[in-house]
Amino acid sequence: MKKIIPKIMIFIMFLAGLSLLLYPLVSNEWNTYRQEQLISSYDSQVAQKTEAGEIDYTAQWDAARAYNEELLPSILPDSFAIAAASEEPDETYMSCLNLNGDGMMGYVAIPKIDIKIPVYHTVKDEVLEKAAGHLEGSSLPAGGGSTHSVISAHRGLPSAALFTDLDKLKEGDHFLLYILDDILCYEVDKISVVEPDDTKDLEVEEGKDLVTLLTCTPYGVNSHRLLVRGHRVPYEEEVMEDTPKSLITGTSLHTSYLLWVVVGLSVTALFILLLYLYEKKKRNQKKHKREQ
């Protein structure tokens, strides 16, 4: 019995270590799957409602643009600083671009880094843990002149990649917003790193249709904010299809965790092998003594 207990403990430690190593990878894959399901469901709902004539998209767009016109110029807060706020969002705001009543406005697609992420109303913790959020107080992502919408998401979460590779975008790259029955295309024209409370780059500019993707930086430190701004350009499907995917320098979150898993398993296997050889050597020594 005394010989069995250490072996059981070693096995338990091995499983615990393996679980810790695999958690980020498995969790990220699960969240990616969930995001794909949500996006697929959203697209299906849009198609079904369009075919059945169940919804007046013109009225939806008009309501969103009317909301944007009524927005007063104001200093926007840091989205991550207000994520835990308990205040309920404005009812008018929540009713706009809310196709299924679940708060999902649509989704953002970034061909360069090969991601599609659902976009929800608000930047509350429960939103940012699983998807991207629209910063209330900024323009709704409905297009039009003199608007500036802000879409925020975390970077480097163990459970989801989200905007982890946002820093790989360059000026001239494109990102898309799939909102209701339309696709809004934006070309990156400005990338900046600012202090969390420096939000002047998020202000509306007269006549311009702008969207900024916002996340924390540097990776793992999160002391500043990375702003990737784009201006509206015509959507051309051929251009998007020709955009190179995942042509990024450095190691992505998925690859990084996979590397750590391989290294961790190799070290664990080596440890078990050495332990086995040590135990075998001890048994041989005892056997040799008994034979003498």
Question: Can you say where each PLM-predicted feature lies in the sequence?
Answer:
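Generic N-terminal leader/processing signal
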Residues: 1, 5, 285-287
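C-terminal single-pass membrane-anchor helix
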Residues: 245-292
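Solvent-exposed, non-transmembrane regions of membrane-associated and secreted proteins
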Residues: 3-253
